[in-house]
Amino acid sequence: MTATLQRRESASLWERFCSWITSTENRLYIGWFGVLMIPTLLTATSVFIIAFVAAPPVDIDGIREPVAGSLLYGNNIISGAVIPSSAAIGIHFYPIWEAASLDEWLYNGGPYQLVVLHFLTGVACYIGREWELSYRLGMRPWISVAFTAPVAAAAAVFLVYPIGQGSFSDGMPLGISGTFNFMLVFQAEHNILMHPFHQLGVAGVFGGSLFSAMHGSLVTSSLIRETSENESANYAYKFGQEEETYNIVAAHGYFGRLIFQYASFNNSRSLHFFLGLWPVVGIWLTALSVSTMAFNLNGFNFNQSVVDSQGRVINTWADIINRANLGMEVMHERNAHNFPLDLASGESLPVALTAPAVNG
């Protein structure tokens, strides 16, 4: 009888735990996806902060020339980064227990893999948590669908691209200047500016910004006045009110006359679906462009494609881009020190001022 009561008590405790995890009454919804999301994101955040502040230099190119990325090794907020794992590791899974020592793990950039893999797991669980909360509240699932766009973009630069290129050292560094360096090298090696999916992604991001500004300004300009001139129009809105707070007919009429009639939505639901769809599809396409270029399916190359009747090349914008790509690729060459010695991190070495005599 005692054993039966203990089983019931433990089952009851488990049921209470399940109801707490899935309760929509909590201040922050946890959910079953949150059970995995919380520890993975906390781990990624903690290791990122520690590595950004104090990680020793990493041999990113596998040529015994470590690159310092942390604040304690001379960087600032702009130049600092968590340096990607060494090219000597490639795309091998490199947890702490695979290294001979902690020093070796740090030297080969182990923290980068730890941060990236935990981060991607965490944000994937965040998608699931959004869907889970929407499901329990009886909402439609489009919030989680929209969030797949930035997650796909992150997965493209942190996971798919390194896999395609054969090494985590080709992944995007976790820092500001490291991100810019990644973008310049990506352009030099893959001509991303001439990739149609990336061009559509640019249209998605900038178009989404334009549509957001247009929508916000139209709504703000057509608010239904319910306050005096001496009060803010915002005071007229009450959270949860049923009546419209702006005149969609006026906004539709204004925009239809400003451009043309059919450029303006007369359905608020289809309008907001479009506002969500446009940037999401654009970022999906950008992630797809990076994922295809990861396997060297690069942007279009129209270099020296325009010639006159004598066969002489007529330079176009494509040739200018090609020249810039070559310059960026040369500057990125491993073990080629293009910068002055006072910008280098190591000690300056003496240089011979006279050429040696060559007999013969």
Curated annotation (Swiss-Prot):
Could you confirm whether the keyword Plastid appears in this record? yes
Q: How does it sit in the membrane?
A: Multi-pass membrane protein
Please list the residues that bind Fe cation: 215, 272
Which residues of this protein are annotated with the site description Cleavage?
344-345
UniProt keywords (A-Z) are:
Calcium, Chlorophyll, Chloroplast, Chromophore, Electron transport, Herbicide resistance, Iron, Magnesium, Manganese, Membrane, Metal-binding, Oxidoreductase, Photosynthesis, Photosystem II, Plastid, Thylakoid, Transmembrane, Transmembrane helix, Transport
How is the cofactor bound, as the UniProt entry phrases it?
The D1/D2 heterodimer binds P680, chlorophylls that are the primary electron donor of PSII, and subsequent electron acceptors. It shares a non-heme iron and each subunit binds pheophytin, quinone, additional chlorophylls, carotenoids and lipids. D1 provides most of the ligands for the Mn4-Ca-O5 cluster of the oxygen-evolving complex (OEC). There is also a Cl(-1) ion associated with D1 and D2, which is required for oxygen evolution. The PSII complex binds additional chlorophylls, carotenoids and specific lipids.
GO biological-process terms attached to the record: photosynthetic electron transport in photosystem II; response to herbicide
So what does this thing catalyse?
Answer: 2 a plastoquinone + 4 hnu + 2 H2O = 2 a plastoquinol + O2
Post-translational modification comment from the UniProt entry: Tyr-161 forms a radical intermediate that is referred to as redox-active TyrZ, YZ or Y-Z. C-terminally processed by CTPA; processing is essential to allow assembly of the oxygen-evolving complex and thus photosynthetic growth.
Question: Which residues are [CaMn4O5] cluster-binding?
Answer: 170, 189, 332-333, 342, 344
SUPFAM superfamilies recorded for this chain?
Bacterial photosystem II reaction centre, L and M subunits (SSF81483)
Q: Which family does it belong to?
A: Belongs to the reaction center PufL/M/PsbA/D family.
Miscellaneous information on this protein? 2 of the reaction center chlorophylls (ChlD1 and ChlD2) are entirely coordinated by water.
Entry protein name: Photosystem II protein D1
